[in-house]
Design a protein with these regions (language model features):
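Juxtamembrane/disordered regions of integral membrane proteins
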Residues: 1-169
Length: 169
Protein backbone atom coordinates (compact mmCIF):
# COMPACT_ATOMS: atom_id res chain seq x y z
CA UNK A 1 0.00 0.00 0.00
CA UNK A 2 1.36 3.39 -0.94
CA UNK A 3 1.92 6.11 1.64
CA UNK A 4 -0.73 8.22 -0.08
CA UNK A 5 -3.31 5.41 0.13
CA UNK A 6 -2.47 4.77 3.78
CA UNK A 7 -2.81 8.48 4.55
CA UNK A 8 -6.17 8.54 2.78
CA UNK A 9 -7.50 5.56 4.74
CA UNK A 10 -6.14 6.81 8.07
CA UNK A 11 -7.69 10.19 7.37
CA UNK A 12 -11.04 8.47 6.79
CA UNK A 13 -10.68 6.64 10.12
CA UNK A 14 -9.87 9.96 11.83
CA UNK A 15 -13.00 11.49 10.28
CA UNK A 16 -15.11 8.60 11.60
CA UNK A 17 -13.68 8.81 15.10
CA UNK A 18 -14.11 12.57 15.10
CA UNK A 19 -17.68 12.38 13.80
CA UNK A 20 -18.53 9.85 16.50
CA UNK A 21 -17.06 12.17 19.13
CA UNK A 22 -19.03 15.07 17.59
CA UNK A 23 -22.22 13.02 17.92
CA UNK A 24 -21.41 12.09 21.52
CA UNK A 25 -20.62 15.69 22.49
CA UNK A 26 -23.92 16.83 20.97
CA UNK A 27 -25.74 14.11 22.94
CA UNK A 28 -23.97 15.24 26.10
CA UNK A 29 -25.00 18.84 25.40
CA UNK A 30 -28.63 17.75 24.96
CA UNK A 31 -28.42 15.72 28.15
CA UNK A 32 -26.99 18.56 30.23
CA UNK A 33 -29.24 21.22 28.72
CA UNK A 34 -32.56 19.42 28.29
CA UNK A 35 -32.18 16.19 30.25
CA UNK A 36 -32.30 14.05 27.10
CA UNK A 37 -31.22 10.52 28.07
CA UNK A 38 -27.83 9.36 26.82
CA UNK A 39 -27.46 6.19 24.77
CA UNK A 40 -26.30 3.23 26.84
CA UNK A 41 -23.35 1.78 24.95
CA UNK A 42 -22.86 -0.78 27.72
CA UNK A 43 -25.88 -2.56 26.24
CA UNK A 44 -24.17 -2.58 22.85
CA UNK A 45 -21.19 -4.20 24.54
CA UNK A 46 -23.48 -6.73 26.23
CA UNK A 47 -24.95 -7.58 22.83
CA UNK A 48 -21.49 -8.11 21.30
CA UNK A 49 -20.29 -10.11 24.33
CA UNK A 50 -23.33 -12.43 24.07
CA UNK A 51 -22.55 -12.97 20.38
CA UNK A 52 -19.40 -14.87 21.35
CA UNK A 53 -21.73 -17.41 22.99
CA UNK A 54 -23.93 -17.63 19.90
CA UNK A 55 -26.75 -15.38 21.13
CA UNK A 56 -27.52 -12.67 18.59
CA UNK A 57 -31.06 -11.71 19.52
CA UNK A 58 -32.65 -11.02 22.90
CA UNK A 59 -36.14 -10.63 24.25
CA UNK A 60 -34.72 -7.75 26.28
CA UNK A 61 -31.05 -6.81 26.14
CA UNK A 62 -31.48 -4.95 29.44
CA UNK A 63 -32.56 -8.22 31.09
CA UNK A 64 -29.80 -10.30 29.49
CA UNK A 65 -27.01 -11.34 31.82
CA UNK A 66 -24.30 -8.76 32.31
CA UNK A 67 -20.88 -9.53 30.87
CA UNK A 68 -17.40 -8.58 31.97
CA UNK A 69 -16.10 -5.50 30.17
CA UNK A 70 -19.43 -4.89 28.40
CA UNK A 71 -19.13 -1.11 28.83
CA UNK A 72 -15.61 -1.01 27.40
CA UNK A 73 -16.63 -3.29 24.54
CA UNK A 74 -19.70 -1.15 23.84
CA UNK A 75 -17.80 2.13 23.72
CA UNK A 76 -15.01 0.65 21.60
CA UNK A 77 -17.59 -0.85 19.22
CA UNK A 78 -19.36 2.52 19.00
CA UNK A 79 -16.17 4.25 17.84
CA UNK A 80 -15.05 1.39 15.57
CA UNK A 81 -18.47 1.43 13.89
CA UNK A 82 -18.13 5.20 13.38
CA UNK A 83 -14.73 4.67 11.75
CA UNK A 84 -16.10 1.88 9.53
CA UNK A 85 -19.00 4.09 8.47
CA UNK A 86 -16.59 6.88 7.51
CA UNK A 87 -14.37 4.45 5.60
CA UNK A 88 -17.46 3.25 3.75
CA UNK A 89 -18.47 6.80 2.84
CA UNK A 90 -14.97 7.61 1.65
CA UNK A 91 -14.60 4.41 -0.37
CA UNK A 92 -17.97 4.76 -2.15
CA UNK A 93 -17.91 8.51 -2.71
CA UNK A 94 -14.77 8.89 -4.77
CA UNK A 95 -13.18 12.27 -4.12
CA UNK A 96 -15.34 13.34 -1.14
CA UNK A 97 -12.55 13.30 1.44
CA UNK A 98 -10.33 15.48 -0.74
CA UNK A 99 -13.23 17.89 -1.36
CA UNK A 100 -15.78 17.36 1.41
CA UNK A 101 -19.30 18.71 1.03
CA UNK A 102 -22.15 18.61 3.51
CA UNK A 103 -24.88 16.86 1.50
CA UNK A 104 -23.18 13.46 0.95
CA UNK A 105 -22.07 13.36 4.59
CA UNK A 106 -25.50 14.34 5.85
CA UNK A 107 -27.34 11.83 3.65
CA UNK A 108 -24.89 9.09 4.54
CA UNK A 109 -25.18 9.86 8.26
CA UNK A 110 -28.97 9.77 8.05
CA UNK A 111 -28.76 6.50 6.10
CA UNK A 112 -26.75 4.85 8.87
CA UNK A 113 -29.87 4.97 11.08
CA UNK A 114 -31.06 1.91 9.15
CA UNK A 115 -28.55 -0.25 11.05
CA UNK A 116 -30.02 0.41 14.49
CA UNK A 117 -33.58 0.39 13.10
CA UNK A 118 -33.25 -2.91 11.23
CA UNK A 119 -30.48 -4.78 13.09
CA UNK A 120 -29.66 -3.51 16.55
CA UNK A 121 -33.07 -2.53 17.93
CA UNK A 122 -34.74 -5.79 16.81
CA UNK A 123 -31.80 -7.75 18.24
CA UNK A 124 -32.13 -5.89 21.53
CA UNK A 125 -35.80 -6.91 21.76
CA UNK A 126 -37.01 -3.40 20.93
CA UNK A 127 -38.63 -4.32 17.61
CA UNK A 128 -37.98 -2.94 14.15
CA UNK A 129 -37.37 0.80 14.44
CA UNK A 130 -38.05 0.65 18.19
CA UNK A 131 -41.65 -0.45 17.58
CA UNK A 132 -41.82 -2.28 20.94
CA UNK A 133 -40.63 0.64 23.06
CA UNK A 134 -43.02 2.67 25.22
CA UNK A 135 -42.69 5.64 22.85
CA UNK A 136 -41.53 4.45 19.40
CA UNK A 137 -41.81 7.88 17.77
CA UNK A 138 -39.57 9.46 20.39
CA UNK A 139 -37.03 6.62 20.12
CA UNK A 140 -37.00 6.90 16.32
CA UNK A 141 -36.54 10.66 16.40
CA UNK A 142 -33.68 10.37 18.88
CA UNK A 143 -31.96 7.81 16.66
CA UNK A 144 -32.52 9.97 13.61
CA UNK A 145 -31.19 13.07 15.39
CA UNK A 146 -28.09 11.18 16.57
CA UNK A 147 -27.31 9.87 13.09
CA UNK A 148 -28.00 13.24 11.48
CA UNK A 149 -25.53 14.75 13.94
CA UNK A 150 -23.07 12.02 12.96
CA UNK A 151 -23.49 13.10 9.32
CA UNK A 152 -22.78 16.73 10.21
CA UNK A 153 -19.78 15.48 12.20
CA UNK A 154 -18.49 13.60 9.15
CA UNK A 155 -18.47 16.84 7.19
CA UNK A 156 -16.98 18.98 9.98
CA UNK A 157 -14.25 16.45 10.68
CA UNK A 158 -13.45 15.92 7.00
CA UNK A 159 -12.94 19.67 6.61
CA UNK A 160 -10.74 19.62 9.71
CA UNK A 161 -8.68 16.67 8.51
CA UNK A 162 -8.15 18.41 5.18
CA UNK A 163 -6.45 21.29 6.98
CA UNK A 164 -4.16 18.98 8.95
CA UNK A 165 -3.34 16.34 6.35
CA UNK A 166 -3.12 16.93 2.61
CA UNK A 167 -5.69 14.43 1.31
CA UNK A 168 -5.80 13.44 -2.35
CA UNK A 169 -8.19 10.95 -3.92
Amino acid sequence: MSTEAATYLLSAVAVGLGATLFMDLWALFLNRTFGTPLANYCLVGRWFRHMSEGTFSHTSIASASQKHFECAVGWIAHYVIGAVYALTLVLVSGNWLAQPSLLPALLFGIGTVLVPFLVMQPSFGLGIAASRTPNPTQARLRSLMAHTTFGVGLYVCAVGVRYVVPVHA
